[in-house]
């Protein structure tokens, strides 16, 4: 038997919100979903009037909903923002080439300028070629590091004031779990921050969907009939995040509020003053923000170009030994060639 919408609008409920358990009609769900994101933007002071904001666009559900809602709220509440789409082409055949077509559709639907940057033009490599070198055990490390820096490079080219990413509540809860399991206190400190970066040397990133459940994002996209790309990356099944995601889904079955509980716990964490803190600086090679010298992207790229794809995987000391060994082998080879030429 149909039940009434809890918002008492007079309509029958069409869905049950995963976040609150409320039975709502579609229109009231849209209103509640959009109002929560507006509250997140305003209460966290994510933007200022007149700013130029790049919406990180992959063509997936999160970035598509983010672009749609940002445009909607910008017009409804007169934020006064100049919105553009920024997309990164990692060079994954059968995945990114198809999803970029969706991004182009978003560009046309939302009337936003679009900038696409590729790994090939930035680094001289595609993910297809990287996976052929490294295999499928550490490929997500390369992709994640290169994509983060590629977004910074794109933002700098576009001259934007901030980058809005589609990270949702599920993503952030997963990241908290991953950092706890890895003992990564440096990332655990900042992974729940709604704004990261900023300052004179970097462009800040913001997460308007920080408190939005993934299930509600999917429902919103479905009922709004938004065009998005839903195929999983062909290289993702072996990613470490997948284990955290499966664990989180199991917890959610027992306790539906676990996603928000984990985020709130992460926000309240405090660390001893003796805990090691990474020092942000500028990479001496590429000129982008880094907490190490050279930055992780430059180390990974050096490894690929040297024929040592595992150079940036693991501890820095291990990478230094690999470089020293290769330099020694090259020196011996060069010396052997000199002796050969003498005869």
Swiss-Prot record:
Could you tell me what this protein is called? Cytoplasmic tRNA 2-thiolation protein 1
Instruction: Return the Pfam families for the record.
Output: ATP_bind_3, zn-ribbon_14
Q: What class of enzyme is it?
A: transferase
MF-aspect GO terms: nucleotidyltransferase activity; tRNA binding
EC number(s) given by UniProt:
2.7.7.-
| HAMAP family documented for this protein | CTU1
**Cross-referenced SUPFAM superfamilies, in alphabetical order?**
Adenine nucleotide alpha hydrolases-like
Q: Which GO terms describe its biological process?
A: protein urmylation; tRNA thio-modification; tRNA wobble position uridine thiolation; tRNA wobble uridine modification
Superkingdom of origin: Eukaryota
Which compartment or compartments is the protein found in? Cytoplasm
From the UniProt record, give the pathway where this protein acts.
tRNA modification; 5-methoxycarbonylmethyl-2-thiouridine-tRNA biosynthesis
Cysteine-cysteine disulfides = none
What family does the entry list? Belongs to the TtcA family. CTU1/NCS6/ATPBD3 subfamily.
Q: Which UniProt keywords apply?
A: Cytoplasm, RNA-binding, Transferase, tRNA processing, tRNA-binding
Organism this protein belongs to: Drosophila grimshawi (Hawaiian fruit fly)
Q: Which GO terms describe its cellular component?
A: cytosol; cytosolic tRNA wobble base thiouridylase complex; mitochondrion
**What is the purpose of this protein?**
Plays a central role in 2-thiolation of mcm(5)S(2)U at tRNA wobble positions of tRNA(Lys), tRNA(Glu) and tRNA(Gln). Directly binds tRNAs and probably acts by catalyzing adenylation of tRNAs, an intermediate required for 2-thiolation. It is unclear whether it acts as a sulfurtransferase that transfers sulfur from thiocarboxylated URM1 onto the uridine of tRNAs at wobble position.
């Amino acid at each position: 038997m149909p039940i009434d919408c809890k918002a008492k609008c007079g309509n029958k409920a069409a869905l049950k919100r995963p976040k609150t358990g409320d039975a709502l009609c579609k229109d009231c769900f849209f209103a509640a979903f959009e109002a929560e994101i507006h509250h997140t933007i305003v209460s966290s002071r994510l933007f200022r009037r007149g700013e130029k904001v790049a919406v990180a666009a992959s063509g997936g559900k999160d970035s598509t909903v983010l672009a749609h809602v940002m445009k909607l709220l910008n017009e409804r509440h007169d934020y006064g923002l100049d919105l553009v789409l920024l997309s990164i082409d990692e060079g994954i055949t059968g995945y990114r080439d198809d999803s970029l077509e969706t991004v182009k559709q978003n560009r046309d639907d939302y009337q936003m300028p679009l900038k696409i940057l590729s790994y090939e033009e930035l680094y001289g490599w595609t993910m297809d070629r990287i996976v052929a070198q490294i295999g499928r055990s550490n490929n997500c490390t390369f992709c994640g590091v290169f994509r983060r820096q590629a977004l910074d490079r794109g933002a700098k080219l576009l001259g934007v004031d901030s980058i809005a990413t589609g990270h949702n509540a599920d993503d952030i809860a997963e990241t908290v779990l991953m950092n706890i399991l890895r003992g990564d206190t440096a990332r655990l400190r900042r992974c729940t921050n709604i704004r990261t970066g900023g300052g004179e040397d970097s462009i800040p990133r913001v997460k308007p969907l920080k408190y939005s459940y993934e299930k509600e994002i999917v429902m919103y996209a479905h009922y709004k009939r938004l065009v998005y790309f839903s195929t999983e990356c062909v290289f993702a099944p072996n990613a470490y995040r997948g284990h955290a995601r499966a664990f989180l889904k199991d917890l959610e079955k027992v306790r539906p509020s676990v996603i928000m509980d984990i985020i709130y716990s992460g926000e309240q964490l405090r660390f001893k003053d003796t805990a090691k803190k990474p020092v942000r600086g500028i990479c001496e090679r590429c000129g982008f923000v880094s907490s190490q010298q050279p930055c992780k992207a430059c180390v990974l790229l050096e490894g690929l170009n040297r024929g040592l794809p595992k150079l940036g995987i693991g501890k820095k000391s291990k990478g230094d030994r690999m470089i020293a060994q290769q330099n020694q082998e090259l020196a011996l080879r060069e010396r052997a060639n000199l002796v050969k030429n003498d005869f």
